[in-house]
Amino acid sequence: MTNIRKSHPLFKIINHSFIDLPAPSNISSWWNFGSLLGVCLILQIITGLFLAMHYTADTTTAFSSVTHICRDVNYGWLIRYLHANGASMFFVCLFLHVGRGIYYGSYTFMETWNIGIILLFAVMATAFMGYVLPWGQMSFWGATVITNLLSAIPYIGTTLVEWIWGGFSVDKATLTRFFAFHFILPFIIAALAMVHLLFLHETGSNNPSGLNSDGDKIPFHPYYTIKDILGVLLLILILVSLVLFSPDLLGDPDNYTPANPLNTPPHIKPEWYFLFAYAILRSIPNKLGGVLALVLSILILALLPLLHTSKQRSLMFRPITQILFWILVADLFTLTWIGGQPVEYPFIIIGQLASILYFSIILIFMPISGIIEDKILKLY
């Protein structure tokens, strides 16, 4: 008799994805982030569901309902801070996951990579709308500033913004629809993540060397299930430490002031995970140009497979491109720092230089270094 996990239609899918899946024997801890993102998503859906039971999407009561959750609901403060800081952990894992993909050349799996980019946009949209829901000062003004960027689109811009707002300003209609979208999007993300995995399992995983690993595969379970559990425990340790010791470390104090359309905060800025893109947006003096740069800062990832010039897939044996990669990482840290600073000298010029460097490394220097490295290899 065949084992039920190999014969049952439902268990068979799980078996082929998480148990008998052939995996390369040399994948490092950088391959843990896929499973960590899955854990983050599940955590966000569960905590979000419990928050939605007590939250009211109305401008008059939204702020009070969040306060009520923190003060009166059993462990409401814990659920709220797990959800808020869980989003930060989600983005940490997301950035490391994408960085791993760039470093080891995983973007050559075109379908998997492109769905990953769609996932990144979906998660960013979800996080943005979630930030609006507590209806604090930064929620309101963040929503106003970011949605207003769409007015830069020629001809239809203003109409589009008013259509999204459901009126002539960010108000009750905006809050209600943002709550609806914030609730539905994580389930769409979960579905997309399954498609992401489906395409990945068509090709099999990449590995640090970037070479074909078909000759040396091991079963996913028990080796990588145990390895993933260790990663999950470390993730939970960091998240719980953050929630219990410093829950407001990554938040903005302005969001503890109820939204007031008549009073603009001195520095409007998004959550830390959007600051790099916000810095790129602000570094261009033209509104439409800034919006295009903002979108392209993420969309540029879709060009990576086309910009790959090297005969080698991974950066493991490519020292020149390695240096460029780490300069790019440092540049992203710089942009994140600049995004949180006021718009004044010297921050403006630093942001502009960092933005130019960001696009130059990806579009010009990395493809050239790939060609140079191939030529150096030919000499030997």
From Swiss-Prot:
Main location: mitochondrion
Residues given in the record as heme b b562 binding sites: 83, 182
A Pfam family it matches: Cytochrom_B_C
Residue positions binding a ubiquinone: 201
CC cofactor: heme b
Subcellular location: Mitochondrion inner membrane
Record: residues binding heme b b566: 97, 196
Function: Component of the ubiquinol-cytochrome c reductase complex (complex III or cytochrome b-c1 complex) that is part of the mitochondrial respiratory chain. The b-c1 complex mediates electron transfer from ubiquinol to cytochrome c. Contributes to the generation of a proton gradient across the mitochondrial membrane that is then used for ATP synthesis.
Misc. comment: Heme 1 (or BL or b562) is low-potential and absorbs at about 562 nm, and heme 2 (or BH or b566) is high-potential and absorbs at about 566 nm.
Record's protein name: Cytochrome b
Organism the protein comes from: Macrotarsomys bastardi
